[in-house]
């Protein structure tokens, strides 16, 4: 009888030692991965010492008598929404050139607009690393564009991510 009781107690203890499988259910709250921090933007701006800088939640706006330069970081995913934010136009209304290097997509575009002080030309670039849109825009008067073209080419060619 003692053997049977001892065997029964051992069986009772051993049944509680088995590993239980955990199953995911619809009601489970899964941890969403945290979005990585935005990368640092590198760009060479002309004449930085005389510019007025306005801080926005998304980036900086550099103001000069001849031009405005915007450097912003926006959420990635919807390029149309980013273009609408930057220049007020949808992708279908613009000619957007797309290239890629080092896992980063690069979108370049230009636009023209009537401003308060006459016609304006705008040029923009968006770098998309899959998490964020890193944006550079320049808007300047349409008059007298020949002498500043080299300067703007240097600004856009220097735009990169660290």
Please report, for each region that a protein language model flagged, where it lies by residue.
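A short acidic-to-branched-hydrophobic micro-motif
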Residues: 59-85
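Signature of long, low-cysteine stretches enriched in small and polar/charged residues
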Residues: 87-131
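Solvent-exposed loop/turn segments at secondary-structure junctions
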Residues: 68, 76-79, 115-116, 141-144
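Short, solvent-exposed secondary-structure boundary motifs
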Residues: 39-55, 84-90, 112-118
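N-terminal targeting leader peptides, primarily classical Sec-type signal peptides for secretion
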Residues: 4, 8-10, 101-106
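Residue-level recognition of conserved beta-strand positions in structured domain cores
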Residues: 73, 137-138
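N-terminal targeting sequences that direct proteins away from the cytosol to non-cytosolic compartments
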Residues: 5-8, 13-60, 64-67, 129-132, ...
